[in-house]
Amino acid sequence: MPVIEDHESILKQCLRITNIARILDIPIIGTEQSPQSLGNNAEALKALCQMTVIKDHFDACIDGLIEALPKDRPQLILTGCETHICLMQTALHLLAAHYDVSILVDATGSRATLNKDYGLQNLRAAGAKLLTVEMVAYEWLKSSKHPKFKEVLAIIK
């Protein structure tokens, strides 16, 4: 991940949203691209995932992501790297499979900003929603009266 532009901030945002998802009992599935040659996901992030799909294709759906998804959850939130390669190809496949796909722009990255920007433009044009970690957290909570509001707020702030 060190080759990804702004990788420390991206990892921080990925950890924020996965911690929030865990608090709210939202399933978390990770993917790892060719870990035998590229290495594993950050251990702190991997520990928050209920499962991790190991993949060699850039599109995680080809290596079993769709089969791993809960059947009762048509809305998906995607984060990760690289925006214009793995994340984009996976999101396009999920959109074609009629999932409601949102991309957390502050929790995605590429080696170059230009690639990330054009990957996000392509995803928006294909029907993906572009959101931020904070937007999704508050959307999940719906109200300051949510029983987990203070716990989530501690992560957001």
Descriptions of predicted regions:
Residues 55-96:
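Internal catalytic-core helix/loop-beta-alpha segment
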Residues 8, 32, 81, 110-111:
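Residue-level marker of alpha-helix boundaries and capping positions
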Residues 59-61, 85, 108-113, 138:
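Short gly/pro/ser/thr-enriched loop/turn and capping motifs at secondary-structure boundaries
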Residues 6-10, 79, 83, 87, ...:
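Short, conserved glycine- and acidic-residue-centered signature motifs
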Residues 77-80, 100-113:
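A short glycine-rich beta-strand->turn/loop micro-motif centered on a GG-aromatic cluster
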Residues 1-57, 67-71, 100-103, 120, ...:
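Active-site acidic carboxylates
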Residues 39-41, 87-90, 113, 142:
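Short glycine-/acidic-enriched loop or helix-start segments at secondary-structure transitions
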Residues 33-34, 106-109, 135:
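Short, ordered loop/turn segments at secondary-structure junctions
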